[in-house]
Amino acid sequence: MALPKYKTSRANTHSRRANWKATAAATVNCPNCGAPALPHMACPSCGNYRGRTYRSAIQPAHTK
């Protein structure tokens, strides 16, 4: 296996890692209630997706 011949400086390391960053999640407004939701997912506030309500699938079946 190849080994580095010289130590990588802090400046080179930091400049290389400067582009390695997280991107914010894209959100869209729900057409039913207007709350922000992830695209292609059911709305967390009203449970609608593509004209159908999936709220019963989101809530737990049994509550004690």
UniProtKB/Swiss-Prot annotation:
A Gene Ontology BP annotation from the UniProt entry: translation
Pfam family, one: Ribosomal_L32p
Residue ranges of coiled coil: none
GO molecular function: structural constituent of ribosome
Source domain of life: Bacteria
Keywords: Ribonucleoprotein, Ribosomal protein
GO cellular component: a single term: large ribosomal subunit
HAMAP family: Ribosomal_bL32
NCBIfam families assigned to the protein according to its UniProt record, in alphabetical order: rpmF_bact
Family: Belongs to the bacterial ribosomal protein bL32 family.
Protein name: Large ribosomal subunit protein bL32
Gene source species: Bifidobacterium longum (strain NCC 2705)
